[in-house]
Amino acid sequence: MTVQPTTIGIVGARGHTGAELIKLIAAHPQLQLVFVSSRELAGQRVAEHSDGYEGELRYESLDADAVAAKAADVVILALPNGKAEPFVAAIDASRPQTLLIDLSADYRFDPAWYYGLPELTRHTYAGQRRISNPGCYATAMQLAITPLREQLAGPPQCFGVSGYSGAGTTPSDKNNPALLADNLMPYALTNHMHEREVSAQLGVPVEFMPHVAPHFRGITMTVNLWLQQPLTREQIHARYLERYAHEPLIEIVDEAPWVSRIAGTQGVQIGGFTMAPGNKRVVVVATLDNLLKGAATQAMQNLNLALGWDELTAIG
């Protein structure tokens, strides 16, 4: 008996994350990519833009109603912030059973949507067909803070540095290699959307200072944590090992991880664990690929979780 594949479409596939999603879908034994929407690439073969995809599928320029009419089992929205609502409304109206995964910030504060950071929230998944993918910085911050969340004596201070792929493909200062050369570009130093996101998810105020660097991909998140009671480095290291012992995508390392070692990989490295005198302050460093665990890989984890498959299918 032949098992019918689960059909999937991507809206907003021109971007860097869309390209990574296509590779993951191509590697998934139970998924069939049936449409890829991009105004800029409409008419061009997907295989010409993705080295992981083989086939004759072409990019299309699809509005919200056209996406809903495709009747795919799964739709992933990889659109800029503020662009998801028409697609969500059209699918809600005609195909409410569709599994819809939104990679933007648009629904991260909506309690009707499952907030999908599997290592921290999979126990709250209850069959929701609307999944909001966390932000890339927000993923790094939450994974770095959570093992010590109950010990915090004040707001964590998070210094984040991202490769310029995090600024998307629309030209701006933050993804201009000429302006970024020999430079580190701070921006949105208070009230960044990921600061609000992490504060809401963890239930504690978080202070976040993002920067863009000249490298293409990968995030380094350096997190300063003040503790209520002194803890030794060994105790803290053990807490992280215990918390993530059964999480194959999270590796606890001894030294502070390097972003150059995580770029292009699916997981997260957390390490450093540097103590200040008195043992009531620790600095923790997390690294991840913003396009993978910060976006596409996490979306695939959420898809697998929602459909009852092994969470790491196509991820490895």
UniProtKB/Swiss-Prot annotation:
Location of the protein in the cell: Cytoplasm
Source organism superkingdom: Bacteria
Pathway linked to the protein: Amino-acid biosynthesis; L-arginine biosynthesis; N(2)-acetyl-L-ornithine from L-glutamate: step 3/4
Any GO MF annotation of the entry: NADP+ binding
Reaction it catalyzes: N-acetyl-L-glutamate 5-semialdehyde + phosphate + NADP(+) = N-acetyl-L-glutamyl 5-phosphate + NADPH + H(+)
Enzyme class, first EC level, given as a word: oxidoreductase
Major location category of this protein: cytoplasm
One BP term from GO: L-arginine biosynthetic process
GO CC annotation: cytoplasm
Record keywords: Amino-acid biosynthesis, Arginine biosynthesis, Cytoplasm, NADP, Oxidoreductase
HAMAP family found in the cross-reference section: ArgC_type1
Family statement drawn from the similarity comment of this UniProt entry: Belongs to the NAGSA dehydrogenase family. Type 1 subfamily.
Protein name: N-acetyl-gamma-glutamyl-phosphate reductase
Gene (name only): argC
